[in-house]
């Protein structure tokens, strides 16, 4: 079964410096029908204006992954980490027992557009940590590239949860197979462009839950970027 989550149905807020869209309930946006999906708790699509951002704030007991679509995002945290995240880079932060961080647009002239994903950890009280990995365009082009996994397989960032996240940049007419083991579920988030899934076209910002489907194909209708979640 494929259940669509159209972009226009998400929670939407424009704070001037930040335009944000919430796939699942987050902050002031509460929808009992969309509280998360298995271990996947948050998919926020954020656009932040030049030189603006999120001041220092705290998190606990959450796996937080950031995937930048355009621009550059500057990160600082209480572990002493300072990094800039750009397209093709996966950043993960395990909040664990507590971490404080800030995120600002690294550019004074261009906006930054990114997805921030929260995944419930397998257990609480983990030691906070940070990791960041760069993936070449060739590794993402017309294939699903594992970017996050519970064991850090294939050079992906490690998640403390039985969840695997893959990314792909697809040229028009190219497709990638989707396969989920028995008892697992999938979620597709279209970051850019348009793709066909199970006879339905999904556009940028759209998402789809996949349950009880062992094999599907994801085909690009236009130049596209997608994230695919494989969830326990």
Which residues are covered by each model-predicted region?
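Jelly-roll (double-stranded beta-helix
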Residues: 1-232
